[in-house]
Amino acid sequence: MAAEEPAMAGEEAVATEGGGLLLEIVGSPLNLSLLGLCLFLLYQILRGERPAAQPGEAGPPPLPKMKRRDFTLEQLRPYDGVRDPRILMAVNGKVFDVTRASKFYGPDGPYGIFAGRDASRGLATFCLDKEALRDDYDDLSDLNATQQETLRDWESQFTFKYHHVGKLLKDGEEPTVYSDEEEKDAQDAKKE
């Protein structure tokens, strides 16, 4: 009988140890609060920053893909997300439709200053001030080699992410007339 008593005491210790962590968490209000906070943060990370959709409410329909064309600076300006819902910006002589990233390039976005403008100088020099914007065509000839390389990197990123809708015209330059076949070829090249 004496041999049975230590064995039973050992079983009780194992039973207490098995639920020990759970009892430790539930037994302390501080631990319970920290567990709740960790679970909430994990939920937020996994869920992402998607805004909650209201029942019966849909966001604005996506704009149709813009046909390829060239722009002067004046023709580009209305596409700032305010005067026109579409947002265009030029990078290194190419015009891109960045509407789907309006969170960044829209009126309230961190890069909103570039909407409807030639963003080349600002992106090349990492300047988000109005001084980086020119009212006339900017040939960017005064950029140093590092800034030119930075600009090419930005151009490459934009080419990969956004729809290239045309080129930025110099003063007096004639626009290119794009055919539907060229548009289709450009879309096919982007898919590859």
From Swiss-Prot:
Residues 70-169 form the Cytochrome b5 heme-binding domain. Residues 172-192 are annotated as: Disordered. One of its GO terms (cellular component) is smooth endoplasmic reticulum membrane. Residues 2-24 are lumenal. Keywords: Endoplasmic reticulum, Iron, Lipid-binding, Membrane, Metal-binding, Microsome, Mitochondrion, Mitochondrion outer membrane, Phosphoprotein, Receptor, Secreted, Steroid-binding, Transmembrane, Transmembrane helix. The modification Phosphothreonine is found at T176. Coiled coil: none annotated. SMART domains: Cyt-b5. SUPFAM superfamilies: Cytochrome b5-like heme/steroid binding domain. It is a single-pass membrane protein. GO terms for biological process: heme biosynthetic process; positive regulation of lipoprotein transport; positive regulation of protein localization to plasma membrane. It comes from the Eukaryota. Residues 44-192 are cytoplasmic. It is found in: Microsome membrane; Smooth endoplasmic reticulum membrane; Mitochondrion outer membrane; Secreted. It holds the Pfam family Cyt-b5. PANTHER family: MEMBRANE-ASSOCIATED PROGESTERONE RECEPTOR COMPONENT 1, MEMBRANE-ASSOCIATED PROGESTERONE RECEPTOR COMPONENT-RELATED. Non-classical progesterone receptors involved in extranuclear signaling are classified in 2 groups: the class II progestin and adipoQ receptor (PAQR) family (also called mPRs) (PAQR5, PAQR6, PAQR7, PAQR8 and PAQR9) and the b5-like heme/steroid-binding protein family (also called MAPRs) (PGRMC1, PGRMC2, NENF and CYB5D2). This is Membrane-associated progesterone receptor component 1. It comes from Gallus gallus.
